[in-house]
Amino acid sequence: TYNYSLTNNFTDINKLAQGYVFSNYNSLFSGNRYLENSTSQVHSLRYFKYNMFNFENIFATVSYSKQVDAIKNKSLLTGVNQVSSAVNINSAFADESLSGSGNYGRSFAKYYKANVRASLNWNKFNNIRVYPDSDANPNNNPTEIQTTESFNHSYTIGFSTNYKTIPNLGLSYNYSISDNFSDVIYTDSP
Protein backbone atom coordinates (compact mmCIF):
# COMPACT_ATOMS: atom_id res chain seq x y z
CA THR A 1 0.00 0.00 0.00
CA TYR A 2 1.37 3.40 -0.99
CA ASN A 3 0.23 6.59 0.76
CA TYR A 4 1.12 10.19 -0.02
CA SER A 5 0.17 13.31 1.88
CA LEU A 6 0.91 16.99 1.35
CA THR A 7 0.18 19.23 4.32
CA ASN A 8 0.40 22.96 4.96
CA ASN A 9 1.53 23.79 8.49
CA PHE A 10 0.55 27.16 9.89
CA THR A 11 2.20 28.80 12.85
CA ASP A 12 0.70 29.95 16.11
CA ILE A 13 -0.81 33.45 15.85
CA ASN A 14 1.41 34.59 18.75
CA LYS A 15 4.48 34.20 16.52
CA LEU A 16 3.01 36.72 14.06
CA ALA A 17 2.41 39.51 16.59
CA GLN A 18 4.79 42.42 15.94
CA GLY A 19 6.75 43.55 18.99
CA TYR A 20 8.32 41.90 22.00
CA VAL A 21 6.52 39.50 24.33
CA PHE A 22 7.87 38.28 27.68
CA SER A 23 8.22 34.50 27.59
CA ASN A 24 9.97 34.29 30.94
CA TYR A 25 11.71 36.66 33.35
CA ASN A 26 14.88 36.57 31.20
CA SER A 27 13.42 35.68 27.81
CA LEU A 28 11.81 37.89 25.16
CA PHE A 29 10.11 36.78 21.96
CA SER A 30 9.97 39.06 18.92
CA GLY A 31 7.08 38.37 16.54
CA ASN A 32 7.47 38.22 12.76
CA ARG A 33 4.47 39.32 10.69
CA TYR A 34 6.08 37.99 7.49
CA LEU A 35 5.96 34.30 8.47
CA GLU A 36 4.44 31.98 5.89
CA ASN A 37 3.18 28.44 6.12
CA SER A 38 5.54 25.50 5.78
CA THR A 39 4.82 22.50 3.59
CA SER A 40 5.42 18.90 4.52
CA GLN A 41 5.08 15.86 2.32
CA VAL A 42 5.06 12.25 3.43
CA HIS A 43 5.50 9.16 1.27
CA SER A 44 4.91 5.75 2.83
CA LEU A 45 4.95 2.24 1.41
CA ARG A 46 3.72 -0.79 3.36
CA TYR A 47 3.69 -4.51 2.57
CA PHE A 48 2.17 -7.35 4.59
CA LYS A 49 1.79 -11.06 3.86
CA TYR A 50 0.52 -13.83 6.12
CA ASN A 51 0.44 -17.54 5.27
CA MET A 52 -1.85 -19.64 7.49
CA PHE A 53 -0.39 -23.00 6.43
CA ASN A 54 3.09 -22.48 7.89
CA PHE A 55 2.31 -19.33 9.92
CA GLU A 56 4.74 -17.29 7.88
CA ASN A 57 4.41 -13.53 8.12
CA ILE A 58 6.30 -10.84 6.24
CA PHE A 59 5.99 -7.16 7.02
CA ALA A 60 7.91 -4.23 5.55
CA THR A 61 7.40 -0.47 5.61
CA VAL A 62 9.29 2.54 4.28
CA SER A 63 8.45 6.18 5.01
CA TYR A 64 10.00 9.44 3.79
CA SER A 65 9.05 12.92 4.97
CA LYS A 66 10.28 16.35 3.94
CA GLN A 67 9.36 19.73 5.42
CA VAL A 68 10.04 22.78 3.25
CA ASP A 69 10.12 26.43 4.43
CA ALA A 70 9.96 25.27 8.04
CA ILE A 71 9.35 27.81 10.77
CA LYS A 72 12.37 27.86 13.08
CA ASN A 73 13.26 29.90 16.12
CA LYS A 74 16.47 31.85 16.13
CA SER A 75 17.66 32.84 19.57
CA LEU A 76 20.28 35.33 20.67
CA LEU A 77 21.82 34.50 24.03
CA THR A 78 23.45 37.36 25.91
CA GLY A 79 24.59 36.15 29.29
CA VAL A 80 21.53 34.57 30.90
CA ASN A 81 19.09 36.59 28.78
CA GLN A 82 17.53 35.38 25.56
CA VAL A 83 15.79 37.13 22.68
CA SER A 84 14.04 34.83 20.19
CA SER A 85 12.30 35.31 16.88
CA ALA A 86 10.60 32.94 14.42
CA VAL A 87 11.61 32.85 10.74
CA ASN A 88 11.00 30.69 7.69
CA ILE A 89 14.17 28.77 6.90
CA ASN A 90 15.27 28.71 3.24
CA SER A 91 13.71 25.87 1.24
CA ALA A 92 17.20 24.66 0.26
CA PHE A 93 17.53 23.54 3.90
CA ALA A 94 14.59 21.15 4.20
CA ASP A 95 14.14 18.89 7.22
CA GLU A 96 14.05 15.28 6.05
CA SER A 97 13.59 11.83 7.55
CA LEU A 98 13.67 8.34 6.09
CA SER A 99 12.70 5.25 8.03
CA GLY A 100 12.20 1.64 7.17
CA SER A 101 11.61 -1.64 8.92
CA GLY A 102 11.09 -5.24 7.98
CA ASN A 103 10.10 -8.40 9.80
CA TYR A 104 10.08 -12.05 8.75
CA GLY A 105 8.73 -14.76 11.02
CA ARG A 106 7.55 -18.31 10.64
CA SER A 107 6.69 -21.43 12.59
CA PHE A 108 8.46 -24.72 12.01
CA ALA A 109 8.43 -28.24 13.45
CA LYS A 110 4.94 -27.52 14.86
CA TYR A 111 6.06 -26.05 18.21
CA TYR A 112 8.77 -23.53 17.32
CA LYS A 113 8.82 -19.99 15.94
CA ALA A 114 11.66 -17.82 14.65
CA ASN A 115 11.75 -14.24 13.44
CA VAL A 116 14.21 -11.71 12.06
CA ARG A 117 13.66 -7.95 12.25
CA ALA A 118 15.58 -4.92 10.98
CA SER A 119 14.88 -1.21 11.26
CA LEU A 120 16.64 1.86 9.86
CA ASN A 121 16.06 5.53 10.63
CA TRP A 122 17.82 8.57 9.11
CA ASN A 123 17.05 12.19 10.08
CA LYS A 124 18.35 15.55 8.92
CA PHE A 125 17.34 18.71 10.79
CA ASN A 126 18.42 22.28 10.13
CA ASN A 127 18.61 24.92 12.84
CA ILE A 128 19.65 28.56 12.88
CA ARG A 129 22.64 29.61 14.95
CA VAL A 130 22.81 33.32 15.81
CA TYR A 131 26.11 35.03 16.55
CA PRO A 132 26.07 38.07 18.86
CA ASP A 133 26.97 41.55 17.65
CA SER A 134 26.81 44.98 19.28
CA ASP A 135 23.00 45.18 19.70
CA ALA A 136 20.41 42.86 21.27
CA ASN A 137 18.21 42.48 18.19
CA PRO A 138 18.38 38.88 16.85
CA ASN A 139 16.91 39.91 13.49
CA ASN A 140 20.05 41.67 12.23
CA ASN A 141 22.77 39.46 13.73
CA PRO A 142 24.94 37.17 11.60
CA THR A 143 23.45 33.68 11.34
CA GLU A 144 24.50 30.26 10.15
CA ILE A 145 22.45 27.19 9.25
CA GLN A 146 23.54 24.17 11.30
CA THR A 147 22.60 20.76 9.94
CA THR A 148 22.27 17.83 12.32
CA GLU A 149 22.07 14.29 10.96
CA SER A 150 21.54 10.98 12.68
CA PHE A 151 21.40 7.39 11.46
CA ASN A 152 20.11 4.60 13.67
CA HIS A 153 19.72 0.96 12.75
CA SER A 154 18.73 -2.09 14.74
CA TYR A 155 18.71 -5.82 14.01
CA THR A 156 16.89 -8.49 16.02
CA ILE A 157 16.75 -12.26 15.76
CA GLY A 158 14.41 -14.28 17.93
CA PHE A 159 13.40 -17.84 18.68
CA SER A 160 10.48 -19.06 20.80
CA THR A 161 8.41 -22.11 21.54
CA ASN A 162 4.70 -22.38 20.84
CA TYR A 163 3.35 -25.03 23.22
CA LYS A 164 -0.27 -25.06 24.28
CA THR A 165 -0.06 -26.91 27.61
CA ILE A 166 3.40 -26.14 29.03
CA PRO A 167 5.19 -22.81 29.56
CA ASN A 168 6.84 -21.27 26.52
CA LEU A 169 10.42 -20.06 26.24
CA GLY A 170 11.63 -17.14 24.14
CA LEU A 171 15.16 -16.00 23.31
CA SER A 172 16.16 -12.99 21.26
CA TYR A 173 19.25 -10.95 20.45
CA ASN A 174 19.27 -7.29 19.41
CA TYR A 175 22.18 -5.33 17.94
CA SER A 176 21.75 -1.60 17.38
CA ILE A 177 23.95 1.23 16.14
CA SER A 178 23.20 4.89 16.82
CA ASP A 179 25.28 7.29 14.72
CA ASN A 180 24.78 11.04 15.06
CA PHE A 181 27.90 11.78 12.96
CA SER A 182 29.91 12.90 15.97
CA ASP A 183 29.45 9.88 18.24
CA VAL A 184 28.65 6.26 17.44
CA ILE A 185 26.99 4.05 20.06
CA TYR A 186 26.84 0.26 19.71
CA THR A 187 24.36 -1.71 21.82
CA ASP A 188 24.10 -5.49 22.25
CA SER A 189 21.15 -6.84 24.19
CA PRO A 190 20.25 -10.51 24.62
Where does each model-flagged region fall?
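Exposed, low-structure sequence patches enriched in small/polar residues
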Residues: 1-190
